[in-house]
Design a protein with these regions (language model features):
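Short helix-coil junctions and helix-kink-helix linkers
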Residues: 37-45
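Short, hydrophobic-biased segments on the C-terminal half of alpha helices
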Residues: 51-55
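Glycine-centered, phosphate/nucleic-acid-interacting loop/turn motifs that mediate DNA/RNA or nucleotide
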Residues: 61
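Short acidic, hydrophobic short linear motifs in intrinsically disordered regions
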Residues: 30-38
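C-terminal regulatory/oligomerization modules of transcriptional regulators
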Residues: 109-155
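Conserved segment of winged-helix/HTH DNA-binding domains
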Residues: 79-105
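Short, cationic-aromatic polyanion-contact patches
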Residues: 11-16, 68-87
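Short capping segments at the starts of secondary-structure elements
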Residues: 13, 25-31
Length: 155
């Protein structure tokens, strides 16, 4: 996989496509038959479903394929970390900026984390403190937010 490949932040991967991508990331290169072997029983999917999902991921340029004999080999240039980061940041882009800190806190509270994970989080918090602002301002469109910080007139 190439480092620092850029995925379009607006590129949405469905939950089903995510399952397929996890198989690709775990194995670098896969055939549709291999993906089906891994997922058909777990997800109760048919081979046709797998092929549809692979084609969607190809259309989104998340996957690429090459032909060897009569088989297609699927792979990706994107790491799981890059796609997960894109997904999470995309989710935070959909909520009021004033609520992001609270949501990050909820994620931490509700996640199983190791001491090493917590050390990484604490280091990130210490680094972020150097550039933190006194107050995060709402940047929502008027009528989309009910935070007290928005300054928007509510009807």
């Amino acid at each position: 996989m190439k480092e620092n490949c850029k995925i379009d932040k607006k590129q949405h991967i469905t939950d089903a496509e995510w399952e397929v991508m996890r198989v690709v990331w775990a194995n670098s290169e896969v055939t549709s038959k291999f993906v089906a072997k891994v997922l058909c029983e777990k997800m109760n999917w048919k081979q046709a479903t797998i092929k549809t999902l692979l084609n969607r991921l190809l259309e989104k340029n998340i996957l690429k394929k090459r032909e060897i004999g009569n088989k297609y080999i699927y792979s990706t240039d994107f790491t799981e970390k890059e796609v997960a980061n894109n997904y999470i940041l995309g989710t935070f882009d959909k909520i009021c900026k004033t609520k992001v800190g609270e949501m990050i806190g909820k994620v931490i509270e509700n996640s199983e984390l190791s001491f090493d994970d917590l050390d990484l989080i604490l280091k990130a918090v210490e680094k972020k403190k150097k550039t933190a602002v006194k107050e995060v301002l709402c940047d929502c469109v008027a009528g989309q937010c009910n935070c007290e910080h928005s300054g928007h007139k509510h009807i």
